[in-house]
């Protein structure tokens, strides 16, 4: 039985969307895997963008290393892929109109070569029978990052219109005497929520400040909060900077990515990129019948839902920086358990939700996997 891991942290140093806690998340997870789960340091690959001696977390390098990790796994092995960095989402192509989240969720490598949920699905579907791959993604819009895997905890597999309807009905049940103005205000606020604008972010104002904020704590301590969300305009700006291409058209972003990066991925991933032509969203069948049909050996723990943002936290007094979800995981795993049993995937995600809610975060972690993994111990047995 082998235990292997690929840990990726991207801070995007020197850019307008720089983060502070992603690389720290990687080092904390590395320590956790070694001390709590018996991983050998030689079997952990680290990719960070703050140390040039490390393999740089470009789109191609991430895909290559994840391919290597999956190819090396045999029956009885436990594999871990941890990602901390920016995330984004784009409308699906015509071939993905049945995506139950209604969007293509992506992670954002340091070279802006997006890795989409279909690519994760294709790679994870190659995990061998009897081998288990656990993916932890502390990034915005990470709910549903592996396409077509069953949602066990979360609300990402609902179409936006269904989410609005559910939220309005729930609000009406709690406050049945709302006036007409308040009723329609609720509709507007819930529509904003489906676009990834949470209440806490709306409260912080618009523009750049819409994904930054501060929380005052006791003893003159302040948390500087920045979400791990890369606005499309910022993504385009960084893409132009990274590639030297100044004439990138937003409406042709998929074709542009294929042109810029299509030669880098493997043939299978090239196919995934070549399908990025049409940006229509189909609100039809959720494709639930396909869930569990593929990627049976992959488990995803997401930092938030597909329409939410994961927080990057900086403690001004101590200088500590971390992802809110990554911190929740570490705090929960390090706490003694009364029953002395190993924490399960379901328990970890459920407890992380409570942990974050108590601390004022709006993000809700999710669990995506086959039914048989829900109550299995986190990472390994």
Curated annotation (Swiss-Prot):
Transmembrane domains' residue ranges: none
Keywords from the named record: Autocatalytic cleavage, Hydrolase, Protease, S-nitrosylation, Thiol protease
Function: Cysteine protease that cleaves specifically after arginine residues. Does not cleave caspase-specific substrates. May be involved in the modulation of programmed cell death activated by oxidative stress.
UniProt-listed Enzyme Commission number(s): 3.4.22.-
Modified residues (S-nitrosocysteine): 140
Pfam families registered for this protein in UniProt: Peptidase_C14
Molecular function GO labels: cysteine-type endopeptidase activity
Family: Belongs to the peptidase C14B family.
Source organism of the structure: Arabidopsis thaliana
GO biological process: hydrogen peroxide-mediated programmed cell death; programmed cell death; proteolysis; response to hydrogen peroxide; response to oxidative stress; response to UV-C
Disulfide bridge positions per record: none
InterPro entries, A to Z: Metacaspase, Pept_C14_caspase
Induction: By UV-C light, hydrogen peroxide and methyl viologen.
Post-translation changes: Proteolytically processed; by an autocatalytic mechanism.
pH dependence: Optimum pH is 7.5-8.5 with t-butoxycarbonyl-GRR-aminomethylcoumarin as substrate.
Protein name as annotated: Metacaspase-8
Catalytic machinery residues: 86, 140
């Amino acid at each position: 039985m082998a235990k292997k891991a690929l840990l990726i942290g991207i801070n995007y140093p020197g850019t307008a969307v720089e983060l502070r806690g992603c690389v720290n998340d990687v080092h904390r997870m590395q320590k956790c895997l070694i001390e709590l789960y018996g991983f050998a340091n030689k079997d952990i690959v680290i990719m960070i963008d703050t140390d040039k001696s490390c393999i740089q977390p470009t789109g191609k390098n991430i895909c290559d290393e994840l391919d290597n990790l999956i190819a090396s796994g045999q029956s009885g092995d436990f594999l871990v892929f941890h990602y901390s960095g920016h995330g984004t989402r784009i409308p699906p192509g015509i071939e993905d109109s049945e995506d139950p989240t209604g969007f293509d969720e992506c992670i954002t490598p340091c070279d802006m070569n997006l890795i989409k949920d279909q690519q994760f699905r294709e790679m994870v579907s190659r995990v061998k029978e009897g081998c288990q791959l656990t993916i932890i993604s502390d990034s915005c819009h990470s709910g549903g990052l592996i396409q077509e895997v069953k949602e066990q905890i979360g609300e990402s597999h609902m179409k936006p219109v269904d989410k609005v309807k559910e939220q309005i009905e729930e609000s009406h049940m709690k406050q049945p005497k709302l006036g007409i103005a308040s009723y329609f205000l609720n509709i507007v606020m819930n529509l904003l929520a489906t676009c990834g604008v949470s209440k806490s972010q709306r409260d912080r104002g618009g523009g750049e400040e819409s994904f930054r904020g501060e929380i005052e704590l006791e003893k003159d301590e302040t948390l500087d909060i920045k979400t791990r969300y890369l606005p499309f305009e910022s993504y385009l700006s960084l893409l132009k900077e990274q590639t030297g291409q100044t004439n990138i058209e937003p409406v042709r972003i998929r074709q542009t990515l294929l042109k810029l990066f299509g030669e880098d991925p493997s043939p299978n991933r090239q196919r995934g990129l070549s399908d990025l032509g049409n940006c229509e969203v189909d609100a039809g069948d959720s494709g639930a019948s396909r869930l569990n049909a593929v990627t049976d050996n992959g488990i995803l723990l997401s930092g938030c839902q597909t329409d939410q943002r994961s927080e990057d936290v900086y403690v001004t007094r101590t200088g500590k920086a971390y992802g809110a979800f990554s911190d929740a995981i570490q705090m929960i795993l390090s706490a003694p358990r009364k029953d002395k049993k190993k924490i399960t995937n379901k328990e970890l995600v459920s407890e992380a939700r409570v942990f974050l809610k108590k601390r004022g975060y709006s993000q809700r972690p999710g669990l995506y996997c086959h039914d048989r993994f829900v109550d299995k111990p986190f990472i390994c047995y």
